[in-house]
Amino acid sequence: MDAAEVEFLAEKELVTIIPNFSLDKIYLIGGDLGPFNPGLPVEVPLWLAINLKQRQKCRLLPPEWMDVEKLEKMRDHERKEETFTPMPSPYYMELTKLLLNHASDNIPKADEIRTLVKDMWDTRIAKLRVSADSFVRQQEAHAKLDNLTLMEINTSGTFLTQALNHMYKLRTNLQPLESTQSQDF
């Protein structure tokens, strides 16, 4: 799975918009959306929110966790813990990127939020590298990676898979070969 596919999955996450138009319910395969009334908040998938925002049909409300104070606490907690801490959304990085690229005018302190999320991302990727290094040095057979997001796994997945394959090959080459010759005299 590549980054574009992960972003596609993230676009299905629900966000809140405040429409400036009236429309009855929309019946889609993924579920019903609406009704849309001017000034009344409604939850829609991110892909629709971005589309409506681009056509100036709504205002996007940032997710509850997309707040400078909350993100600072999460960043500090992530830095203090040795293990990966739960993220506010399984798609926190993709949501931040998409919302800030398409609706930064609707998000207070957008630049600070971008920096805080990038700090959390960098901290988590650094932890992942340290974990992978420790994993290789200890010659472990399996690892437990709780609280990683799909994008984080995707970012390091190729490297980890290749590293594990190389380790497997090295281990099988180092094991003593079993004798195939008979010991009969």
Swiss-Prot record:
Keywords: Acetylation, Chromosome, DNA replication, Isopeptide bond, Nucleus, Phosphoprotein, Ubl conjugation. The modification N-acetylmethionine is found at residue 1. The modification Phosphothreonine is found at residue 180. One of its GO terms (biological process) is double-strand break repair via break-induced replication. CDD domains: GINS_A_psf2 (cd11712), GINS_B_Psf2 (cd21694). SUPFAM superfamilies: GINS helical bundle-like, PriA/YqbF domain. The keyword Nucleus applies. There is a cross-link at residue 109 (Glycyl lysine isopeptide (Lys-Gly) (interchain with G-Cter in SUMO2)). The modification Phosphoserine is found at residue 182. It is found in: Nucleus; Chromosome. Required for correct functioning of the GINS complex, a complex that plays an essential role in the initiation of DNA replication, and progression of DNA replication forks. GINS complex is a core component of CDC45-MCM-GINS (CMG) helicase, the molecular machine that unwinds template DNA during replication, and around which the replisome is built. This is DNA replication complex GINS protein PSF2.
